[in-house]
Amino acid sequence: MSFAELLERTGGMGRFQITQVALMCFPILLMASHNLLQNFSAAIPDHKCKANDTWYQSNNTDRMGYVRLSAPLDADGQPDRCLEYVEVQWMIAGTNRTWANSSQLATRPCTEGWEYSKDEFNSTIITEWDLVCGHKNRRQLAQSVYMGGVLVGAIILGGLSDRYGRRALLIWSYFQMAVSGLCSAFSPNYLSYCIFRFLTGMALSGIGLNTTALIVEWVPTRVRTITGTLAGFSYTVGQLLLAGLAYAMRDWRWLQLCVSLPFFIFFLYSWWFPESARWLVLSGKTERAVKEMKKVAKLNGKEEEGEKITLESMRSDMIKELACAKSSYTVIDLIRTSTIRRISCALSLVWFSTSFAYYGLAMDLQNFNVSIYLIQVIFGAVDFPAKIFSTTAMIYVGRKFTQLMSLILGGVVILANSFVPHEMQTVRTGMAVFGKGCLAASFSCVFLYTTELYPTVIRQSGLGLCSTMARIGGIVAPLVKILGEYYPFLPLVIYGGAPIISGLCVFFLPETVNKPLPDTIEEVEKRIKAPKKENEMNEIVSLKKKEGMKENPVNDVL
């Protein structure tokens, strides 16, 4: 009897599993908010050089008149946001003269700071620390620092969970998220903000990895797809929730508090979660595993079945799992054989490009000239049909085709969007939304596809590699936006080209629909080579038939 059958005996998808999954989905709502938080907390309001109050008051000039006299025009014919004249051009006061000769006048960066519009935001980190003009790239850097924390968290907290358990690391991650998020809200300067956001990113990885592990290891195999989809939809709802919270909280510090304080509640009730019995057995803690299984059986109303579980029965039921645990495998096994190496290379590119393009679009909402709150809702809502389509296509068409089409179609749409004139904002927004939906479908597919491609003995290592590549994509994505300052079309070309290239690499991956999960590397190698041998045999038989027909004169007549 396997551990999956043992779970069915103790209630299957019972009251305990339903309660646990529900409680773990609440934090996922706010994980989406933290990932996309800088769309609002680091939004850039309209701004201009701050007026010298003493000068324009003493000269009987209103504020707009002062701006006209003190700032040159930019390429769009508007007062420049970053430059001012060295000397105020008082000679054009009270006239209709323009800045025709402004290029010949001496200018300098704003000396008094900046004035920011409060039409949409009361306060952001941009207005707090003047992250504009010469410091504007710090906005993208802050998001990359956060994604760097997500990467480091995946490496450190993911590894520690295999040593100290999923439950302990999940509890710690909730606490770290609450504290670091709280500290971010009270950051006195940009440097401390980046440090606390880095720690927040680490905690987010710990929550994501250990939540997934506890859900998967406590629910029966038959409902894993459903619970995984539920978690995915929770993330999507979280994107809609962020738009509502940001609309209500126009101050970035209050918004940061709003998405961080609930993690103290999650931290408190997470002590109720039991440790993964599967992990306990594989870690040699069978006695505690028996206690946890009995507790779960009791909660599911299967107390009699729980009493039948003993140390001996638990060990005998998990012989296969224990045998796999005793085998020694390392990250090197991900590239040791030709087939696994091909799978690892292709999946690494798929994960990188999906995350890279996804966050490149999702973190650039202000460029659509639409209400940032509305576009956040639209970008979040498109994930619902995308994930429904992806799930349906995976079942009826297959994983390979779904993955390939979602990447190539998304990449082509994003690439084409770079050629649409900026005046056609409705078309540009619609294409961006469609492209983001394709990438959401890709994310939904690649999680399951990766799990099915890697054998049991190196599955966690494979997922770890792919997760790392996705984090690197998330780190690089904001930095590519900086190129747009020099070549406006270039970011979309890069965001669109990456999914197309990775989509072509999917051609080299095998189909996994309706096939049992492989347990060993040898099993994967045989599964790939078997169809090739079968095709070779069919070709040989076909050639022999043709040769036989040529040698037989009756066949020639016929």
Swiss-Prot record:
InterPro entries in the cross-refs: MFS_dom, MFS_sugar_transport-like, MFS_trans_sf, Orgcat_transp/SVOP, Sugar_transporter_CS
Disulfide bonds: none
Matching SUPFAM superfamilies: MFS general substrate transporter (SSF103473)
Keyword check for Cell membrane: yes
Sample GO molecular function, one term: transmembrane transporter activity
Pfam family, one: Sugar_tr
Annotated Gene3D superfamilies: MFS general substrate transporter like domains
Keyword set includes Transmembrane helix: yes
Compartment annotation: Cell membrane; Basolateral cell membrane; Basal cell membrane
Keyword tags: Cell membrane, Membrane, Transmembrane, Transmembrane helix
Primary role: Involved in the renal elimination of endogenous and exogenous organic anions. Mediates the sodium-independent uptake of p-aminohippurate (PAH), 2,3-dimercapto-1-propanesulfonic acid (DMPS), cidofovir, adefovir, 9-(2-phosphonylmethoxyethyl) guanine (PMEG), 9-(2-phosphonylmethoxyethyl) diaminopurine (PMEDAP), ochratoxin (OTA), acyclovir (ACV), 3'-azido-3-'deoxythymidine (AZT), cimetidine (CMD), 2,4-dichloro-phenoxyacetate (2,4-D), hippurate (HA), indoleacetate (IA), indoxyl sulfate (IS) and 3-carboxy-4-methyl-5-propyl-2-furanpropionate (CMPF) and edaravone sulfate.
Protein known as: Solute carrier family 22 member 6-A
